[in-house]
Regions:
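C-terminal regulatory/interaction module of P-loop NTP-utilizing enzymes
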Residues: 1-181
């Protein structure tokens, strides 16, 4: 049996941090497996028996994008922390740190545009990763400010569903006019 991350985490002598990203995309069997790890810091493997955390149990972080509901049993074994989208100031500082070459006015307009988009009824709201990707794209295109044509041409960077792109395309002129002020 080749040790995978869960088994390695339990065997780590000095303890460790285990990140299980996007748990909502895992199947129910994996969720069930996690119940034993999170409650008893052990895993039962029919071929080799029960493996317990050696000295210090791992610190486990689970992330979810809420694509499906996770089980109540798993929720009971976790502390819940909701991280909302950043406000304008924080998002601006994140963009400045991750895309330092972005012109200040473009950064202001981009962040405001994203904040406005998040108020719309979209299938998937743009996350900070999409904002960063869009900022990098606009810098590569030598944009100095958000022009409606460029916004329409690059909406696929921030919106992941064609329906959202089509809906927002009709709003681009109004949104860019609003943030130009």
């Amino acid at each position: 049996l080749e040790p995978r991350p869960l088994l390695k985490a339990l065997r780590e002598e000095n303890g460790c941090v285990l990140l299980i990203d996007e748990i909502d995309k895992a199947d129910h069997e994996f969720e069930s497996l996690l119940l034993e790890i999170l409650s008893d810091y052990q895993i039962s493997i029919p071929e080799i028996g029960t493996v317990k955390a050696t000295t210090e149990p791992p610190i486990v972080f689970l992330t979810s994008n809420n694509t499906r509901e996770i089980s109540d049993a798993l929720k009971r074994r976790c502390l819940h922390l909701y991280i909302p989208f950043p406000d304008t100031d924080l998002e601006s500082r994140i963009i400045e740190a991750r895309v330092p070459e972005i012109p200040p006015e473009l950064k202001r307009q981009l962040v405001q545009f994203i904040q406005e988009l998040r108020q719309l009824d979209l299938k998937k709201l743009p996350a900070i990763s999409e904002t960063i990707d869009w900022a990098r794209t606009l810098v590569l295109l030598h944009a100095e400010s958000l022009e409606p044509k460029m916004v329409k041409d690059t909406l696929n960077v921030i919106l992941k569903f064609q329906e959202d792109i089509e809906n927002v395309s009709g709003e681009v002129n109004a949104l860019t006019a609003k943030i130009a002020k």
